[in-house]
Amino acid sequence: MRIEEDIKLDYSDVLFRPKRSTLHSRKDVKLVRTYKFKYSNNEWSGIPIMAANMDGVGELEVAKNLAEFEIITNLTKQHNTKTIKRCSYIKSIYPHLALSTGTSDEDFKRIKDILKEFSFFQFICIDIANGYSDHFSKFVKSVREKYPT
């Protein structure tokens, strides 16, 4: 066991000060934001909320509904070329879909097959339990090399 004796901060050490607002009403709030991504230099505009890639949430029907609000849906890892083909005619949802994957060789092959047939995906969600592992870092690097944009 390691004993750490340095001072740690907790919630009582943090002070949130509300920022003055020029808005008169909540309806004046604009949720759409534009982001420029560091590694690809691509820009994306939309509402920065992502629906999880969980069963029942990361599904094509959910994506159709959330795309109307410019919200991204991370498709579940179970989706393949056959299931994605079912929605490929709905071009309005393309900018609001993210392809989810694990980090196994089979997962990488699956996303390569999907992206070969459907190049409209702008986002890849790499979903694993431990994002601190070396394996995860290497997988992210290989995905960035294969799909730089």
Predicted regions located by residue number:
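Active-site entrance/lid segments in N-terminal catalytic domains of soluble metabolic enzymes
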Residues: 1-149
